């Protein structure tokens, strides 16, 4: 039995009690969520994170105290909420998305921060030069990068070889996408594909981006993972509705897209990353520093192919792609 499990067992049986009139002080973990308290996306991040933390012996109210703040999808609130959490002097801060990570890192340079997950470019900037050995107080896990998106686009080209104009739906406020489609041109320049940059920040301007997509006569659409676009159910529904009406194949690095009706998706599993982030939090609570914990790139990817969507589009998915799929939707 590990030390954490041993302490938890003693606490549960009453063999360890705070002295009379004195409350036992538990380590404090602060969590900043950019979404609302009941947002669907938290089921992919906060829930698996907390479940993994509990398996490691950190039960809220018993062996750890957890405080949470929610920005309700308003990024302008993140800096104030981050400062509010830092004022509580937690042992560790946990957050996700590039915007939230930037806000928390801007609020403290001393309290350890675990990010699970965020974009590669932002984590490099926050951690300080080296992913392998962070020099700042930030460590965590990469979800998105230009290289990951280029792999997904290559898969889309394999599935739709006649596509010559591919739209890239990007959030101009996402630092990891400021130079798209330059990385895709570099990685896939020999494919004969022209990329069309389509910008949207959320529900308010997604329709304008889709109108541009129609005017530009794109043959296919790729949606990189972004908390305001790919991970936003309302935006996702409008994009998929557009695709059905225009008969445009869609791929994404956000796995839910394929399950909701896109042709395919390829990317890392957010719940797996969140669970691994819990392991980093546990190690910091036990004395590790962010510098001891390298920022991890995704090592495993899930590929989903939606044959139902392919049939509706009149497409035949190559057998080579079907056999590589981890999940096939009939």
Can you annotate each of these PLM segments?
Residues 1-330:
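Short hydrophobic alpha-helices and adjacent helix-cap/hinge residues
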């Amino acid at each position: 039995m590990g030390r954490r499990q041993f302490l938890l067992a003693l606490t549960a049986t009453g063999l360890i009690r705070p002295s009379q009139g004195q409350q036992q002080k538990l380590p404090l973990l602060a969590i900043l969520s950019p979404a609302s308290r009941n947002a669907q996306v938290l089921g992919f991040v906060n829930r698996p994170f907390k479940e993994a933390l509990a398996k490691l012996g950190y039960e809220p109210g018993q062996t750890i105290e957890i405080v949470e703040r929610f920005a309700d999808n308003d990024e302008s609130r993140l800096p104030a909420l981050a400062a509010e959490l830092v004022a509580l002097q937690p042992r560790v801060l946990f957050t996700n998305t590039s915007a939230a990570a930037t806000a928390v890192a801007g609020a403290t340079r001393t309290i350890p921060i675990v990010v699970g997950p965020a974009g590669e470019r932002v984590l490099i900037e926050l951690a300080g030069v080296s992913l392998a050995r962070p020099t700042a107080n930030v460590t965590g896990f990469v979800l998105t990068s230009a290289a990951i998106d280029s792999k997904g686009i290559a898969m889309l080209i394999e599935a739709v070889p006649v596509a010559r104009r591919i739209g890239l739906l990007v959030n101009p406020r996402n630092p990891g996408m400021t130079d798209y489609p330059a990385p895709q041109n570099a990685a896939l320049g020999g494919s004969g594909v022209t990329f069309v940059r389509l910008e949207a920040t959320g529900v308010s301007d997604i329709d304008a981006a889709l109108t541009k997509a129609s005017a530009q006569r794109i043959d296919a659409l790729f949606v990189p993972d972004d908390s305001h676009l790919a991970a936003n159910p309302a935006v996702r529904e409008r994009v998929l509705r557009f695709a059905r009406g225009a008969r445009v194949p869609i791929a994404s690095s956000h796995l839910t897209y394929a399950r909701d009706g896109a042709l395919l998706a390829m990317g890392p599993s957010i719940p797996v990353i969140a669970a691994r982030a819990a392991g980093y939090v546990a190690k910091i609570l036990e004395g590790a520093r962010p510098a001891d914990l390298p920022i991890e790139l995704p090592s495993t990817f899930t590929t989903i192919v939606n044959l139902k969507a392919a049939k509706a589009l009149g497409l035949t998915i190559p057998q080579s792609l079907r056999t590589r799929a981890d999940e096939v939707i009939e």
